[in-house]
Amino acid sequence: MAMGNPELRTHFFRSSHEPGIPNSLRFPNGFLVTCGLPWLLLLFSVTIILFHPLRKKSDLPLINPGKGRIGILRGYRSRKTFTTELPRLVADGLSKASAFRIAAPDGVNIVLAPSYAHEIAEHPDLNPGPIAGDEFNSHINGFEVFAQLGTSDVISESVRTRLTRQLTKLTPLLTSETPLLLQSQWKDAPDWVEVSPHETALFILSRLSSLVFVGDDLGRNPDWIRILTSYNTEAFAAAEELNLWPQILRPLIARLKPSCRQLRRYIRDARALLVPVLEQRRHAQSQGDRREYNDAIEWLDETSRSTGQPYDPILSQMLLAIGSFHTSSDLLGQVLLDLCMRPDWKVLVRELRKEIISSLQGEGWDKIALNNLKLMDSVLKESQRLKPASTVTMGRYASREITLSDGTIIPKGSTVFIANVAMRDSNIYPDPDDFVPDRFTTRREKGDSSAYLVSASPEHLGFGLGRHACPGRFFAANELKIVLSHMLMKYDIKLPDNGAVAPSKSGIFLATNPDARICVRRRKEEIVI
């Protein structure tokens, strides 16, 4: 369950009322919809033109100021370039300064070079909580799942402590479920079949994570899986569309857009499925049932009671799904493509199979076996290095004005990111654009403690850095190794004739291309795993 870099926080039953239209703007007999809406949009637009141009908040250079004299048009063009051209903007910015500004949908953000990563990660006045809320408009109904970020520590503490402590107990569940899920997707055909690595990864990992998060009954419910995977995918797209509008108009636009209305339905449907499970467990406990549940429903509740912090069980589960489904499936899908794109892919897959067989010859799937998958660990980390989840990372909100060690000033209220470029730095990684499967295995042999998949360092920010690094990365690493082992032992893989497909880019996100395909063929595995 790779949580990406957003640290999972939550709040109990946060009010999710839609922002209402002030009484002064209400019209009788449906006038607002039929006649008043165009004038209301015009009024808001004029307000923005007059009072909301892109303003300087610091002396740092602004890379995408936009063109034109009208503030609203200039702001739209800046937001558009952020969405479509962020990698180029970051490269342009770093060629001019180690600290610069970029106009984004949620305002003008500060981007810093990787050399600032440690300082930003440990600064007490830089908090990741508000970032996702702004980016995903968490104050708007339908996006309130993201409001769980930054309001309490219930989710992050549940993942960091309770989930991590249960890794050994969860391994049998993952290893027994994975072959069933994989067979349902790739079948047993002896001939080559074309499949989507993205869809396969999402299908398997969403179901494995759901079993861990909500238990056996609801975790196997196809409606629950559909709701969470659909919300996971569509919330990002809806937020991107909404962010092209000025902030002042977004609550109104969200009321009208079908995609935003659909998000609200997903939340209602998820609540309708999970609430009966919660009530059933509470009723059973009140009747003396002492059954112990090893899932996130219980971990969240235990953490809330031990810390005294409230949370919303439904929104918390949806946020866990976003953190788990999205980043883990993206990495697994990309690894499959990277393996197939290697000129010597047959040799590499053969070496990985040898390592799997050797690792499982002892006690089977245990902690030692997972730790012995060193080449696989390196392959996963190398794939994440070449195609991280985002162009910028470690988003932080400045709660007061901050002066960094080199004199750079971060104004109060600023959003700060680290440019995710160190992983392509030739001074750190020789041949940085090449996929080198054993790159991190070699580093581990030389005593580099940062060369493990789960290690976070300024040179590899795949899981963030410092106290806000992804708390679920240890579970994610185990889950990915188990699933990839079953894939490689049970199937041959290769690229189709039309070859590789580049990752897709949108805003800060870099994703495995959903149109990419690989070919798979059932093989006879050397050992039963």
UniProtKB/Swiss-Prot annotation:
Phenotype of the disrupted gene, per the record: Impairs the synthesis of austinol and dehydroaustinol and accumulates the intermediate compound austinolide.
Membrane topology: Single-pass membrane protein
Transmembrane segments: 31-51
Location of the protein in the cell: Membrane
Gene Ontology CC: membrane
EC category: oxidoreductase
Cofactor(s) the record lists: heme
Pathway: Secondary metabolite biosynthesis; terpenoid biosynthesis
PROSITE patterns: CYTOCHROME_P450 (PS00086)
Record InterPro entries: Cyt_P450, Cyt_P450_CS, Cyt_P450_E_grp-IV, Cyt_P450_sf
GO molecular function: heme binding; iron ion binding; monooxygenase activity; oxidoreductase activity, acting on paired donors, with incorporation or reduction of molecular oxygen
SUPFAM superfamilies: Cytochrome P450
CDD domains in the cross-refs: CYP503A1-like
Enzyme Commission no: 1.-.-.-
GO biological-process terms attached to the record: austinol biosynthetic process; dehydroaustinol biosynthetic process; terpenoid biosynthetic process
Residues bound to heme: 470
Location, primary (coarse class): membrane
Domain of life according to the entry: Eukaryota
Entry keyword set: Heme, Iron, Membrane, Metal-binding, Monooxygenase, Oxidoreductase, Transmembrane, Transmembrane helix
Additional detail: In A.calidoustus, the austinoid gene cluster lies on a contiguous DNA region, while clusters from E.nidulans and P.brasilianum are split in their respective genomes. Genetic rearrangements provoked variability among the clusters and E.nidulans produces the least number of austionoid derivatives with the end products austinol and dehydroaustinol, while P.brasilianum can produce until acetoxydehydroaustin, and A.calidoustus produces the highest number of identified derivatives.
Similarity section: Belongs to the cytochrome P450 family.
Record PANTHER family: CYTOCHROME P450, CYTOCHROME P450 MONOOXYGENASE AUSG-RELATED
Protein role: Cytochrome P450 monooxygenase; part of the gene cluster B that mediates the biosynthesis of austinol and dehydroaustinol, two fungal meroterpenoids. The first step of the pathway is the synthesis of 3,5-dimethylorsellinic acid by the polyketide synthase ausA. 3,5-dimethylorsellinic acid is then prenylated by the polyprenyl transferase ausN. Further epoxidation by the FAD-dependent monooxygenase ausM and cyclization by the probable terpene cyclase ausL lead to the formation of protoaustinoid A.
Descriptive protein name: Cytochrome P450 monooxygenase ausG
Gene source species: Emericella nidulans (strain FGSC A4 / ATCC 38163 / CBS 112.46 / NRRL 194 / M139)
